[in-house]
Amino acid sequence: QQADASASAFHTIVRDVALELSPLIAERALDFSLQAEPLTLPAHEWMLRELTRNLLHNAVRHTPPGGPLCITLARVGDQARLTVADGGPGVEPDLAKRLFQPFHSGAGGSGFGLGLAICHEITQALGGSIQLHNRRQNGRIVGLDAIVTLPLS
């Protein structure tokens, strides 16, 4: 699927998706930040857009009003790393693995449980990976980091 892809400006896609979702971010008064290093990937634009939209939408939904939401896109070696760090409740370790399967949803059970499964399929198709990590501070969970790593070439 990736072989016939033209190069896509991932940083522009990330900014565009953040702009699309800005009404939801504003409605929840989230403490939002975005840092995106200019990176071009050999991937279809729609795949990167869908990946980013699903991750960001999940983060917006699970971050409490006024909470932090940070998106970072950076080059790490020969890979692009997209991190969506929310201020939500995190996930239980056994649930984290199941969230990448269709029709599994996390806390609150809202949605159909397809977003992260779609993200997983897209990252696999692009030769990358996706991981979920609870962020801890003083022994308690203060948010979830969704980390996508994709090859730059």
Model feature map: region roles:
Residues 66-78:
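Short beta-strand/loop element within the Bergerat-fold HATPase_c
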Residues 59-60:
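Short helix-loop "hinge" at the ATP-lid/N-box region of the Bergerat-fold HATPase_c
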Residues 24-33:
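Short conserved segments within the C-terminal catalytic ATPase subdomain
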Residues 91-103:
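Short conserved segment of the HATPase_c
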Residues 86:
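Acidic ATP/Mg2+-coordinating residue in the GHKL
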Residues 115, 119:
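Short alpha-helical Gxxx[C/S/T] motif in the catalytic ATP-binding
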